[in-house]
Amino acid sequence: MVSRFYQIPGTHRPSSAISSSNESSSLLSARRISQTYFNYQATPECQKVSSKYDPDNPNKDKLGTYDGVFVPTALNVLSILMFLRFGFILGQLGIICTIGLLLLSYTINLLTTLSISAISTNGTVRGGGAYYMISRSLGPEFGGSIGLVFFLGQVFNAGMNAVGIIEPLLYNLGYSAQGEPPAALGELLPRGHWHEFTYATVILFLCFSVAFVGSQTVSRAGNILFLVLAASIFSIPLSALIRSPFTEGGISYTGPSWQTFHDNLLPHLTKGAAGSLLKGKETFNDLFGVFFPATAGIFAGAGMSSELRKPSKSIPKGTLWGLLFTFICYAVVVFSMGCSIPRRSLYDEVQIIQTISSVQWVIFMGEMATSLFSIIVGMLGAAYVLEAIAKDNIIPGLEIFAHSPLYSLIFTWILTQLCLFSDVNKIATFITMTFLMTFVVMNLACFLLGISSAPNFRPSFKYFNRYTTAIGALLSVVAMLIVDGISASVLFLAMILLFLFIHYFSPPKSWGDVSQSLIYHQVRKYLLRLRQDNIKYWRPQILLFVDNPRTSWNLIRFCNHLKKGGLYILGHVAVTADFPKQLNELKTQQKAWMKIRDMAAIKAFVQVGTGPSLIWGIRNVFIGSGLGGMKPNITVVGFFDLESYRKHIPQSRSQNNLQKQVEIKATVPRSTCSDVKINVPLPTDECKNETKVNVQQWVQIVEDLSLMQSNIAIAHGFKNLEIPNKRDSCFPKKTIDLYPIQMCGKVEAKGDQPAAITTNFDTYTLILQLAAILVTVPEWKRTHSLRVILFVEQEYHRTNETQRMKKLLQVLRIDAEVLVVSLDQFRVYNTIVKGDPIVFDYVNSKLADNEWWKDLVEARDTLKPKRRFSTIEPQTIAKQFTQSRKYTSGVQKLGVSFTMNTRMPTNRIDTPCESEDSDLDTDLTSIRDAFSASTNISVGKDLTTKSKTGSDRTNLLVKNLQSDVSTQSLRPVFSSNTLPRTRVVEDGTGEQPTLIPIAEPDLSNGNGTGSGIGNGNKLKKPVLPELSPCCSKDSLVTAMQNLGFNDLPSTAQHLVLNDVMTQMSKSSDLIFSTLPVPALGTHEDHDASLQYVEDLDIWLEGLPPCMLINSQTMTVTTAL
């Protein structure tokens, strides 16, 4: 079809010389035929060379598939039991059940052989056969335990053949006993117990000598013995065809007969048959236990793995062909005997096969051939297994067998010699158990490798899958229970004990095992399914930032206890501006911290992060830690090293005005536990030392963690913590004190949204939760108990607060003692709030550079009562009033309102000048009214603390986060409010909080101590606080009644808390309390950052080890 494009006006068709008329033609010229010159068919194929003649094969002189696997497997499976016990088993079970038993046994063998073939073709197989394959697949615990069991099975198999060979030997060459027919071939050997033991010993020693010469000699002997055995088996159906029927000495032979076949078709269990050792009637279980060893020699070829040229090829091929050959032989023998020998003859004669044979000496030679080779292979295979176990050094005490194969062969020979004291049937049952146990574990190994989907499990043998391996393992277990359930249970118990022994006493191995692949598969699967949305299953998942393990050793170990089955990550930051150059250093640090983890014996992951700065490194570690639902929910950071900071910066703001401190009489002494001394070199000693964090960086870390909604824990003084060990016990128990201090405010109404009371109930409960978790750790449970300490400002609140906390602890199922104290019992509080001068010097030294404190002191000095004289001049009164106004305004700017009480104390004697003082009383009343006015200060976004007078004492309106340090230092961070009432959501499921704090009606009182959260309507009206007895009462009452703990600036609050805790927790081992987080942007101002850190330092000074906690998530629930 011709394009219509050229029919548009203004277009023209290009000339034919430039363009082809075919518009769809390719822009490139057609490829010339001559350019395709490579012909793959002409490449000569590499000629296949047998491994026996391959000059590059270092094992070319070793055994191949036929002589190394097929012959040993055939000779070992075609056991002496075929000649000694097939007549007995066929007479009891009949042809159908015997063939069924044969099919069951060979099904187990075939499925196990498929597993052996798969594992052996997945890599290089060295000496040890089944042990080597299992140990490298399932690990040293499984390999060592099953290796010992398999070793004993091989030993008992050799012993069974050594004992079993005596019967045909005496039948053919022994002296005839009285009443018994003469020997078949000649009377040469005397009978008797010790004679028989001597014959077996001599035969065993001859077999040991052949095995001692070497595998090549065993191979040559095996080829000859295999031909003899094949001729012997071939003679059985041949005799059934050519020999005429006869009856001789109670033994009858009918030849091939349908009647005989019909009579022998079904089972007929009897007792007392020849070859039976049971006093009662035979059972299927006992017969299976005797029959199975006749088919269980499939590991004979695999046991020769160290002597094979190419084990991965020879083991599957030789074993499968050996199984097929032996199954045909057994089936032919069963049908030949079943259709030609009457059942009575099968009951009465053990050597019935030789008795009805046309060439009896051939049967005797076959019996000798299979027995001798089974003994040789059994001892040699067992010796190889023992040598392999010894070389792997997984069981202590076997090192001697690793030096020379001769030692393991001699030891195997001695153990086999001990088996000669037992009976064939008993040995056969034990061999069944050991072989079946080996089958179970071999199939299990292949099954686990298959389901683990390990990329490197790619066996060249493809005729297996997870179903064949699972069925093989299951059938093997069922077969064990069929034979003897008690023996199977005992063997399983022995396996478990061996497993545990190897697990705890064997040195670590670098083989790797399938458990790693399975763990990976399951972890990936369940990590994708893991959710953290249900509070019921909350657990601490800790990220601990550590710089130097020497200074944080106790904290590292403490967090390991605190995690209580949760996630634990050791985080470290390496600051680098040039990542490629520092990559090797990062790898070195990663390895070093992993060694630190192992030295500390903690269950933790290691996360080493990097960044151009410490802050970015912290962010990277936090964001990159964990996987899926296993992400850190608590970040632990050590407290800022303020002492080192002051040494390096002596002109810090805090030291410029630092005065001589006056110690309180009852302070907490320093812990008797010295700093942690680690006298051994640590792996991190060789790593690069990071620059010390500065105060602004430390505050920014806390801000960032809060911004990323992480629960934060600040650890202080943990170098003095004495961590209990497993052997410690203590009575009475030591104390862990909990101070769940409230930080609450009020969110102002905005539009349609009503005002709401806010509390730090999440932090409150997390403190209780972590402490409760810690005392469930066995080391802490035996040595420590919990104590919850609360404080209120008024004595009448104590009872109510105690009841609420006990109720909360009962709901949370936490066992702890509850103490509630009143702040007016403590000196620092009385000095700051009530003007008590008892520790004024100490408080003044701590608050010397605090403007709020200066103004308060000056206001109190101005309002200090003076003696009233009737001659007082009005000018003095006016001057005093003016000065009071001035300082009243100064204090008022700080958000503090005072209510002055003009009532005289009742115990004062009235002066005659009372009327003259009326004007002064009026003026002071004016001052009181002025002080009662509330003022605003910028401290937090839309947050206010509400006084109990009903007026807003501090209107917290933040318009700019970057307020100056003087303003920030005035912010109250704690509250003395009583514990909020809580409501339990009874139908909760754990997805949402089931314990909810209730905001109760706000009651006003006249003392301004608290916001009223948690106060019920039933509470009586508060009583005004009494004046300190140290205050002068000569004139007007000058107590500033509305000043309370909630009104104090942060520094003063921290000082009060320090006094409370030093008095209450002087003998405690550990303290948990609330962490006030800095406002966002605090780190941008050095003085504000330093003020925040110094406030915390004032609080924690002289205290036992403390952990300050801030939570942003609910961690407790009452849901089932």
Curated annotation (Swiss-Prot):
Residues 84-85, 167-193, 243-283, 339-360, 415-430, 483-487 are vacuolar. The modification Phosphoserine is found at S34, S654, S915, S918. Belongs to the SLC12A transporter family. This is Vacuolar cation-chloride cotransporter 1. Signal peptide: none annotated. Keywords: Calcium, Calcium transport, Ion transport, Membrane, Phosphoprotein, Potassium, Potassium transport, Transmembrane, Transmembrane helix, Transport, Vacuole. It comes from the Eukaryota. GO terms for molecular function: potassium:chloride symporter activity. Disruption phenotype: Affects vacuolar morphology and decreases survival upon hyperosmotic stress. It is a multi-pass membrane protein. PANTHER family: GH08340P, SOLUTE CARRIER FAMILY 12, CATION COTRANSPORTERS. Catalyzes the coordinated symport of chloride with potassium ions across the vacuolar membrane. Involved in vacuolar osmoregulation. Residues 1-62, 107-145, 215-221, 305-317, 382-393, 452-462, 507-1120 are cytoplasmic. The chain crosses the membrane at residues 63-83, 86-106, 146-166, 194-214, 222-242, 284-304, 318-338, 361-381, 394-414, 431-451, 463-482, 488-506. It is found in: Vacuole membrane. The keyword Nucleotide-binding does not apply. GO terms for biological process: calcium ion transport; cell volume homeostasis; chloride ion homeostasis; chloride transmembrane transport; potassium ion homeostasis; vacuolar transmembrane transport. Residues 1-21 are annotated as: Disordered. GO terms for cellular component: fungal-type vacuole membrane; vacuolar membrane; vacuole-mitochondrion membrane contact site.
